[in-house]
Amino acid sequence: MKATALFLAASALAAVSAGAYDGYGYDPRPASSYNKTISGAAHIGYDSRYAYKDVVASSVLNRSGVFNIGGELNLNLARDWKQEIGAEYMAFCDGLLSDKDAFDASWKAVKELFPNLSFRGGYELNYGGLPGYLSKHMGKAPHSLAQSVTAGLAYDDPGHGYFGSLDVQYGFYGMIGWRVDLNAGKRWSGLIHEKVDLELSAGTGYSSSYWGPGVAGFDQVNIKLAAPVRVTGVDSSRGFRVIPFIQLDWAGNTRSEIRRYAGMNAIEDFRIRVGVEAVYRF
């Protein structure tokens, strides 16, 4: 089952990568975008409900949403490899998760395999939030902490508007097990206004033994619509943007087993999330 899910996910990402040029909103990537010595982003935003990789926490854990602030720094690593260093702080408005600050951090090594397609692999740390809370609540760790290693592919073609990602995660502390996340979408540049894009994407997540021994299946399915507004800059690779969004999230067939192992209603069956994010890229 896990092998089948991985095969289907990889095939779907390959299909997105091979998407045909539709001729609308062509905005080619600047030639130097991948060769910058240093680049990065800073963001601040609000989401009406907290979700960990699109698995929405229940109203017991968080009902009124979460504010987040974070950033990412991209530096040269070695030869044609880059490194991405990211961090994010989350402040929960209410619920059991609001009793503890939440912090995520990551380090990834990145290599461009082909134009617009890159490999990334590294380490992630989650303090608090859904993985951190359940790590301690379920007795998997003495602290509200989860750690994992990750590897995956990311595709982004600003010219033709197709984007997608396939990420494989293995949790080795706290939440122990496998997770696979697949996302794919299409961006229409200037469809609404010359400075307003439209992005439509969909995704899903599959896990094996991550939430509990023998728990395997699809964790969630989601559809997201976003309308990035370019305030400054000539394209999405740099400058300031404001991104309102709406997202529909459905829990997968692992939801009952997740609740059983957690001993509580930890995730939602269905939720509509709305939010906004301000992002500055340099």
Indicate where each model-derived feature is located.
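Outer-membrane pore/translocation modules
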Residues: 49-65, 86-183, 254-272
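Short loop/turn motifs that connect adjacent beta-strands in outer-membrane beta-barrel proteins
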Residues: 22-23, 27-39, 76-84, 96-97, ...
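Transmembrane beta-strands of outer-membrane beta-barrel proteins
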Residues: 39-49, 70-72, 84-90, 120-126, ...
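Outer-membrane beta-barrel architecture
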Residues: 43, 70-72, 104-110, 150-154, ...
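Predominantly the C-terminal beta-signal and adjacent terminal strand-loop region
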Residues: 200, 223-282
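Cleavable N-terminal export/targeting peptides
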Residues: 1-41
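Residue-level detection of beta-strand scaffold positions
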Residues: 40-46, 68, 80-81, 106-107, ...
